[in-house]
UniProtKB/Swiss-Prot annotation:
UniProt GO cellular component terms: cytoplasm
Protein name: Holo-[acyl-carrier-protein] synthase
UniProt xrefs under NCBIfam families: pantethn_trn, PRK00070.3-1
Gene3D superfamilies associated with the record: 4'-phosphopantetheinyl transferase domain
Catalysis: reaction(s): apo-[ACP] + CoA = holo-[ACP] + adenosine 3',5'-bisphosphate + H(+)
GO molecular function: holo-[acyl-carrier-protein] synthase activity; magnesium ion binding
Top-rank taxon: Bacteria
HAMAP family: AcpS (MF_00101)
One matching Pfam family: ACPS
Major subcellular site: cytoplasm
């Protein structure tokens, strides 16, 4: 297997929380029901968990876009809902894809890591193909 893309995203928790509270925000539609349920089940800050997941979605998009260097984009920009960050019973994250992006990345393994420090969250995504 070889690495075909690497993406990273860094987000400010206060800025994100402010945007989530704005009327008409797209963030409610960005997260899957499972992601919203996980966020409400955690004892940490409500904005913290979705923020790391948002960063992971952005990191996956950046990794995939980077793997298509000098090629025209083939997916719409509003694909965040098709990228779901799920966790196992120990909280380890994994990416589950649906829709068109799942078809494009069918043979790709996605590795993802999330982190929080102070008022910042970050995620790294690595795409690996056979």
């Amino acid at each position: 297997m070889g690495i075909v893309g690497v993406g990273i995203d860094l987000v400010s928790i206060p800025d994100f929380a402010e945007q989530v509270d704005q009327p008409g925000t797209v963030f409610a539609e960005t997260f899957t029901p499972g992601e919203r349920r996980d966020a409400s089940d955690k004892s940490s800050s409500a904005a913290r968990l979705p923020l790391a997941r948002w960063a992971a979605k952005e990191a996956v998009i950046k990794a995939w876009s980077g793997s298509r260097f000098a090629q025209r984009p083939v997916l719409p920009e509003d694909i965040h809902r098709d990228i779901e960050v799920v966790t196992d019973m120990w909280g380890r994250p994994r990416v589950r894809l649906t829709g068109a992006i799942a078809e494009y990345l069918a043979d790709v393994t996605i590795h993802v890591s999330l982190t929080h420090e102070g008022d910042t969250a970050a995620a790294v995504a690595i795409l690996e193909a056979p």
